[in-house]
């Protein structure tokens, strides 16, 4: 790729008969922070070691600033590219300062020793990563997180245009994790290139401008976080059910692994919500394995967004649209096949009064009693209040906890017949 600072061209890596990487293409430009993600054994560390010139590819080639890396000596390569290993265990009894000064080795002459300027650079960098005053301590005496920060500081002391970081935050708390990735972003803004393998998909989405997803040695997806982190792709590669949603504080994507679902005994439950009132109950009943349906929801409502992300069958209308008689008829098929319909707590006005009429078509109706943190049930017309009172007279009023217990009882076959009125 034209303009790439670091590039893998159809790179493969084989150990005996095992093909660890299979024809991987990757081009990283200046000003780009690329996160390499994937399950354990996908080939992330192998790819990073190939990019760094620490392993020779079985096929293909690695180019650094347009030059085949295999033709560069280690000192010349290290002047342009710094590698941080995820292994922070000490091999020799070095002080922190001695570890940092190893980053200056590529910039020294054959018989040249580090000078005051090199030591000053090391001290400034140590302060930059938040570890002032530990330069004379033994590297082996540091905690795992401190060692990782020192090794990251060493890559900064090396002063390269390309940085390759293998799980740089695996031993760090969230404060120091943010420090490392924020510093990496600063390097990118200066025109450098950063490639990092990242275990957490949410962290990768927050800090990286681009993600490369590896699966069994091949590139499964490559693009912006919102292009790569799609539930259908992640579920297939990782073998789990996930929910990908925007973080309301950062605007970046958060990936959550959904709990493994119980059987739910095949019971079908329809949820009628609004204003996000069905979100918590939907999540819990989904986890318990009930066959859920929902609606009628308004587009962009939290209920509708959750049902869509979980693949729950539901009916919806446009945002701010009135629920019409035709909408109610369309949704009746879901209510008619449900063993139980649950009417959640939400404000009822002209736009959604049709949901009360839909509840009246249920075989068995539970009216959810609002809790202290739930949306209050309020009415903006006497008609809505009258319809609700009629529904309430023939239904069971239950709390969140009581609903879960009642569904469990019914799914065990103890609740044949109609629900008692309350």
Please give the residue ranges for each predicted region.
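The feature captures the beta-strand-to-loop junction immediately N-terminal to the Walker
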Residues: 37-39
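Conserved ABC ATPase "signature" region
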Residues: 101, 116-134, 159
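ABC ATPase nucleotide-binding domains
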Residues: 239-312, 317-323, 343, 392-422
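Helix-to-loop junction immediately C-terminal to a conserved catalytic motif
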Residues: 52
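Conserved ABC transporter NBD signature motif
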Residues: 60-68
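Catalytic Walker B motif of ABC-type/P-loop ATPase nucleotide-binding domains
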Residues: 163-167
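Conserved ABC ATPase "signature" C-loop
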Residues: 216-217, 223
């Amino acid at each position: 790729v034209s303009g790439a600072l670091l590039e893998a061209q159809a790179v493969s890596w084989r150990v005996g008969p095992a093909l660890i990487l299979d024809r991987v293409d990757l081009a990283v430009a200046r000003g780009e922070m690329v996160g390499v993600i994937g399950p354990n054994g996908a080939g992330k560390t192998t790819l990073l070691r190939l990019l760094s010139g620490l392993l020779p590819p079985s096929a293909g080639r690695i180019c650094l600033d347009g030059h085949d890396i295999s033709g560069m000596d280690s000192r010349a390569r290290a002047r342009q590219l710094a590698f941080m290993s995820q292994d922070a265990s000490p091999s020799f009894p070095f002080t922190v300062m001695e570890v940092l000064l190893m980053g200056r080795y590529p910039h020294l002459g054959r018989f040249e020793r580090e000078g005051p300027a090199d030591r000053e650079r090391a001290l400034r960098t140590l302060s930059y990563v938040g570890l002032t005053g530990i330069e004379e301590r033994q590297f082996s005496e540091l905690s795992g997180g401190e060692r990782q920060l020192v090794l990251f500081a060493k890559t900064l002391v090396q002063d390269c245009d390309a940085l390759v970081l293998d799980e740089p935050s695996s031993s760090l708390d969230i404060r120091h994790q943010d420090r490392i990735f924020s510093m990496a972003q600063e390097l990118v803004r200066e025109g450098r290139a950063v490639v990092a393998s990242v275990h957490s998909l949410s962290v990768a989405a927050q800090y990286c401008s681009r993600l490369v997803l590896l699966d069994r040695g091949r590139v499964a997806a490559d693009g912006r976080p919102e292009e790569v982190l799609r539930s259908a792709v992640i579920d297939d590669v990782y073998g789990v059910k996930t929910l990908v949603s925007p973080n309301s504080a950062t605007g970046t994507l958060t990936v959550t692994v959904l709990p493994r679902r119980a059987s739910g005994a095949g019971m079908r439950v329809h949820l009628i919500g609004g204003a996000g009132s069905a979100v918590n109950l939907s999540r819990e009943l989904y986890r318990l394995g009930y066959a859920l349906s929902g609606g009628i929801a308004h587009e962009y409502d939290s209920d509708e967004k959750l049902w869509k992300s979980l693949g729950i069958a539901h009916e919806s209308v446009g945002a701010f649209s009135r629920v019409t008689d035709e909408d109610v008829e369309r949704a009746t098929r879901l209510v008619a096949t449900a063993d139980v319909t649950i009417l959640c707590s939400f404000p009822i006005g002209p736009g959604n009064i049709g949901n009360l009429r839909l509840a009246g078509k249920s075989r068995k109706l539970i009216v959810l009693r609002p809790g202290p943190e739930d949306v209050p049930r309020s009415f903006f017309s006497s008609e809505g209040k009258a319809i609700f009172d009629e529904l309430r007279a023939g239904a069971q009023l239950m709390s969140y906890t009581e609903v879960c217990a009642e569904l469990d009882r019914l799914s065990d076959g103890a609740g044949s017949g109609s629900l008692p009125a309350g």
